[in-house]
């Protein structure tokens, strides 16, 4: 039933959130297990085409975890990092604006760079969502997901990705 499905989904979300908190507490100085746990939770709960976690050092964005998309696309995205945050890149705009960026359709969205449209074509995505990881209001990274189909992301996914990003921000602060 729909009620059972909703309960299961809620339990899965709570489990993923608890797992990330467990990893944060067990690896206070090593961020990679945290980023990997976030990516695992995102892939399990959202079933996106691809997902990425990036760290921002104040100057450059570094890809620290990636999953999904065709294997050759994984290489192409790794080749683009580190990079400076630019408004024409989904993650770059997310970091610069310190805001959630949602692209409903890469083919029609305004303000995207040719590189972003090319990346979408290579990786096979049409819609994307990027959420900043903040520490004291300053960007320390971002989490992004993409889907092969165009369209808006459900509000619950946006909120849960924001929760994961907040947890990652705490982990970054703890590691410093």
Describe these PLM feature segments:
Residues 131-143:
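Short hydrophobic/glycine-rich mini-motifs in sensory/regulatory modules
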Residues 162-169:
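Allosteric cytosolic regulatory segments
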